[in-house]
């Protein structure tokens, strides 16, 4: 039955993406190509994160969630995420990765992923693990 719950399916994919991101972070110093890989892993992880939030909110009866900004705001209001400003900064970084490529910007985003965003993803994973365990 749990396999039919969309947010849990999405959460499983989020975990896989987060594990991939962790490999880049654990590596430490990255080559230019690896740094580009970290940005891609961040993009995938971010997309799966906000979509997991959206799916969970819809599963819980919430509506009017049209994009990541709505999902983040509502997720913060309901305690799914604790650092709303951090998630909004992450949204801004995600938008920058898809609309521009600039080495300095990429370096700044890589630094933010390692020092800030990865921790936010870990907290989100912990929250959804708790919610998933409460369901069983």
What are these regions (language model features)?
Residues 1-136:
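Solvent-exposed interaction patches of small proteins and small membrane subunits
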């Amino acid at each position: 039955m749990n396999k039919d719950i969309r947010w849990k399916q999405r959460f499983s994919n989020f975990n896989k993406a987060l594990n991939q991101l962790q490999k880049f972070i654990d590596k430490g110093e990255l080559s230019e190509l690896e740094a580009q890989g970290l940005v891609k892993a961040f993009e995938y992880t971010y997309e799966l994160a906000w979509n997991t939030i959206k799916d969970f909110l819809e599963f819980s009866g919430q509506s009017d969630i049209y994009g990541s900004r709505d999902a983040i705001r509502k997720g913060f209001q309901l305690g799914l995420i604790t650092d709303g400003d951090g998630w909004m900064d992450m949204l801004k970084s995600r938008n920058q990765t898809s609309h521009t490529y600039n080495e300095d910007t990429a370096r700044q985003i890589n630094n933010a992923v390692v020092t800030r965003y990865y921790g936010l993803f870990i907290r989100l994973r912990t929250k959804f693990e708790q919610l998933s365990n409460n369901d069983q």
